[in-house]
């Protein structure tokens, strides 16, 4: 609701809040310094628990980018963190074997059994949105197995049909033998 968002912005503009929330090390990545809250970019996310999307200007010299953190209250992020740690581990192992799937596992830090922080991955989208946008029928979007493949192809025009995992196609010139999965 616009009124709720404006009240949140009004609260965050108070000097005490700006001072407390500025010039911090990111709890998700201590090597990242969070300069100042970009109040106008902060919002509530459109989901049941209304997570708070907080955007910061990045204090890193010359980076000039923004850093986002989602604060969630009411969700248990401990399983999310474990899953993401397993994905990070698999990504490292795959890269050691020469397989770079270009993954960006985001940071997740439970701060309690029902609260926590999640790293915002800029210029990304959810699988649900991809399925909805790349499917012909919204009612069956979640069951459309081609939606994700069509999205991958639209983002990677150099990819061609060939051997791969399931029906996924891979870039030309990459050795993918031995990676096919049994269905």
Protein language model features and the residues they cover:
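Eukaryotic intrinsically disordered, low-complexity, charge-rich
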Residues: 2-7
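Conserved ATP-binding subdomain of kinase catalytic cores across diverse folds
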Residues: 8-181
């Amino acid at each position: 609701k616009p009124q709720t968002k404006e009240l949140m912005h009004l609260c965050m503009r108070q000097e005490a809040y700006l001072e407390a929330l500025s010039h911090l090390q990111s709890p998700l990545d201590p090597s990242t310094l969070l300069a100042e809250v970009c109040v106008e970019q902060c919002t509530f996310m459109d989901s049941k628990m209304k997570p708070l999307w907080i955007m910061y200007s990045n204090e890193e010299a010359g980076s000039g980018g923004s850093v986002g953190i989602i604060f969630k209250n009411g969700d248990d992020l401990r399983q999310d963190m474990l899953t993401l740690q397993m994905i990070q581990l698999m990504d490292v192992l795959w890269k050691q074997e020469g397989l770079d799937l270009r993954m960006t596992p985001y940071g997740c830090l439970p701060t309690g059994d029902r609260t926590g922080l999640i790293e915002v991955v800029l210029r990304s989208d959810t699988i649900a949105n991809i399925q909805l946008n790349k499917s012909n029928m919204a009612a069956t979007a979640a069951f459309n197995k081609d939606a994700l493949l069509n999205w991958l192809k639209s983002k990677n025009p150099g990819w061609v049909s060939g051997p791969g995992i399931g029906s996924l196609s891979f870039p030309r010139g990459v050795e993918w033998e031995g990676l096919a999965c049994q269905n």
